[in-house]
Each structure stands twice: as C-alpha cells, then as structure tokens.
C-alpha cells in the first residue's frame, strides 16, 4: 500500500497555537514538527522558517501567518502560527484560518497574562470549539517552586471554564528542550499531540450539513424559468428538493427543477461546487444577489446581532478617525452589502482604528445570518474592518 493514498484517507483538522507573546507558541510549533518527524509524519521546520511568516490577505486585511503541515498516526493537521498579537486577532476574526481547535501555550514561569485572556475570549467569540493547554518552560521551574505550577494550572482552569471551555487537558513540557532533542521532552510533545488527537473531535464535513448556497447571480432562460447561480457553501441539493429563498425580502419556498454545472445537467450539487439552480414558479424579479437558497427552515433572516470586530489601522487602509454609536457602514455578508447602524457597549465612547471590540449592529434589511458567521465592514467600497457574529439578537 503506497503512503500517498494512506495520507489522503486521514481526517483533516485545522488547529493553531494561541497565547501570550513570548510564551513559546512558535517554538512549540517547531517542536511538534521535530517530534513527529522522528516518526516520518512531518518535515521538521525550524523556528526561523516558521517565524519568517508570509503575508496573506483575508477579507481585504493583511495578516502574517505561517501554515505548517504535519500528521499524527490518525490525522492530518494544518497548523497556523502568527507572529504578532494583532495578527492573531485579525486571523481569528476574519477566519483566514478557521480553527477546529487550538493549543493554548502558557509559560509556567509567568502564568496567564493579558493576551492569554484575550485569546481565550477571542477563541470563544469566534467559535473555536476546543482548547488543549501546553504549560511551557517547565524546565525553568525549580523544585521548591513546583507548587506554583499547580496554582498556575488552577488559574488557567478557572479562566477557561469562565469562557465555557470545560475539562481542557493540560500537558506540561518544554518546547525549547524538545526542539533541542531532549528525549523526555520530545515525549511530552507527543503526549500533547495525543491529547489533541483525543480531545479535538473531527468536525462535521460541510457536505453533511444542511444545504445552503449564497446567490451570486440571477437570470431567466426563456421557456424554462429562473436560474440562480452561486457556490454551494454546504450540504447537497438534488433535483425536486424543496428549498427556501431567505434574506432581503420575505422568505419564499420553491422547488429545484434542475441543477447545472458548466451547462451540463446534474442530478445533484455538492458543497464547494459552482452551480446554477432552476427554480419553479420564481420570477426573475422575485430573487436577487445576496439572498441564500437553503434547506427549508435551516436558516432564518435576521437584522440585529452582537459581533466581535477588528477595525483596521490607517496603515492597513482603514479609517483615519474613530467612529461612534450611530456609525452606518456597509456590512458585507457572503455575497451582499447591507447598511447597518452600530451601537457601542456602555462605557465605550468611541472605537479607534486598530481596536478589537464588541458591539451591536442593526441592519436596514434582513439577511440570512448565523452565529459564528464572518463578515467585512466596508465604507465607500474599501474594507475598514472584519467581524464575526457572536450572538443573534433579532
């Protein structure tokens, strides 16, 4: 049996290292590749190759992030590591690398620090479902200070539980020692990856979720009816399925009478495919770009929500001035821009470029929204921020 086919059959998981600056996130990422390269499951990547991160763009925002690939016996992992705190905030909020779980790296010598707390909160707001903790720099702790590590652990458990992360496994080790080849500490990194394998479940594949397709374009075919086109976000749609058109106007129900791809008729369309759907009894003026076609009652139109937002700095092409309650930019969801009115939380007078903030939005027309969904904030055609819906209000 060739190795290639074996690799493709492993479930794929996206994870990332999060935590306070200088607690050892990048060193740990390198140490994981070192530990697994011994089993032929990873190519060893040294610190500088990960730290020298390429720039990428997500929703118009530049993010520095390194993507490292490796495998355990059971899974294939794509691991994201960011150099700066602002890059983490942007990466998590824009969903540039959507995480199925995260490894929270905490230095045993410092314990939980401000960014540790901020990353845990951010992970909760953007819907990172599971966290495994690596208590790093254990080699720096003297025997008489050993009890301090227990206190650090207790504080971490409390912090995590407060944000809804219960029963997170905590592995103690030293990323640097593992990277230097110390066998006992390499074993600790393996233990960490075993905990990741065991505690971060394989996510449901997009294909198994309820059907949804954002509409990009609408046109009529004489004698046949109205066709809507787009890329299927999730699920499967078959000819003669009942579907709903949701967003921007009143929800309508219809039946799919044809599925086409590259002008060929298909029995079904699947997640990830670009298709045209022929809809029964729907006029060209009944439907528009920005609505979604979906499994009936799987998504509802909403106008009001709470969100976690990163506001671009001036240098990133963002605003030059702060904004206040009553600010009315465009919110870009999937394929549509809708104007919304911002209400800042009590005690926050204004939002400055570069801030990471939570606020409420009231849209002027209803859109098919879900918690955890990403969006861009635009003003005059340029992106000035990005966000994730943390809670739907109405």
From Swiss-Prot:
Task: From the UniProt record, list the reaction(s) this protein catalyses.
Answer: GTP + H2O = GDP + phosphate + H(+)
List where in the cell it is found.
Cytoplasm
Q: Entry's PROSITE patterns?
A: G_TR_1, G_TR_2
Which amino acids does the record list as binding Mg(2+)? 26
The ranges of region (G5) come to: 174-176
Reply yes or no: does the keyword GTP-binding apply.
yes
For this protein, what is any one GO molecular function term?
translation elongation factor activity
Domain tr-type G span(s) in chain numbering: 10-204
- GO biological process terms on file: translational elongation
What are the entry keywords? Cytoplasm, Elongation factor, GTP-binding, Hydrolase, Magnesium, Metal-binding, Nucleotide-binding, Protein biosynthesis
Residues involved in GTP binding: 19-26, 81-85, 136-139
Q: Give positions of region: G4.
A: 136-139
Where is the region G1?
Answer: 19-26
Q: Which family does it belong to?
A: Belongs to the TRAFAC class translation factor GTPase superfamily. Classic translation factor GTPase family. EF-Tu/EF-1A subfamily.
What does the annotation say about its assembly with partners?
A: Monomer.
| Name of this protein | Elongation factor Tu
Q: Which organism is it from?
A: Chlamydia trachomatis serovar D (strain ATCC VR-885 / DSM 19411 / UW-3/Cx)
Query: What gene does the UniProt entry assign to this protein?
Result: tuf
């Amino acid at each position: 049996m060739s190795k290639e086919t074996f690799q493709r059959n492993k479930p794929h998981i996206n994870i990332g290292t999060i935590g306070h600056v200088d607690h050892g996130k990048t060193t740990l990422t390198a140490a994981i590749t070192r530990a697994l390269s011994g089993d032929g499951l990873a190519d060893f990547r040294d610190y500088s190759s990960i730290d020298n991160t390429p720039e990428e763009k997500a929703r118009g925002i530049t993010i520095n992030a390194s993507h490292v690939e490796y495998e355990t016996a059971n899974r294939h992992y794509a691991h994201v590591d960011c150099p700066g705190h602002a890059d983490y905030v942007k990466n998590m909020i824009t969903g540039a690398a959507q995480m199925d779980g995260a490894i929270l790296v905490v230095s045993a010598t410092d314990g939980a620090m401000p960014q540790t707390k901020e990353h845990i909160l951010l992970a909760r707001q953007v819907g990172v479902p599971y966290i495994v903790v690596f208590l790093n720099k254990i080699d720096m702790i003297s025997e008489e200070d050993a009890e301090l590590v227990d206190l650090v652990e207790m504080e971490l458990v409390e912090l995590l539980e407060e944000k809804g992360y219960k029963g997170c496994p905590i592995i103690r080790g030293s990323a640097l020692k593992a990277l230097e080849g110390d066998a006992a500490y390499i074993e600790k990194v393996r233990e960490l990856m075993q905990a990741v394998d065991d505690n971060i479940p394989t996510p449901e594949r997009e294909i198994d979720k309820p059907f949804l397709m954002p509409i990009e374009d609408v046109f009529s075919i004489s004698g046949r009816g109205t066709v809507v086109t787009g890329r299927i976000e999730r699920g499967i749609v078959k000819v003669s399925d009942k579907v709903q058109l949701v967003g921007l106007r009143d929800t309508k129900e219809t039946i799919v009478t044809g599925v086409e791809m590259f002008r060929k008729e298909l029995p079904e369309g699947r997640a990830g495919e670009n298709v045209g759907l022929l809809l029964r009894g729907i006029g060209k003026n009944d439907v528009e770009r920005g609505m979604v076609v979906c499994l009936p009652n799987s998504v509802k139109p909403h106008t009001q929500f709470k969100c976690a937002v990163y506001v671009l700095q001036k240098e990133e092409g963002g605003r030059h001035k702060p904004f206040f309650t009553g600010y009315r930019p465009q919110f870009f969801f999937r394929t549509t821009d809708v104007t919304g009115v911002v209400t800042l939380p009590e005690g926050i007078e204004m939002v400055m470029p570069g801030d990471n903030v939570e606020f409420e939005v009231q849209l002027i027309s209803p859109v098919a929204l879900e918690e955890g969904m990403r969006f861009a904030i635009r003003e005059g055609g340029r992106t000035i921020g990005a966000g994730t819906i943390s809670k739907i209000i109405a």
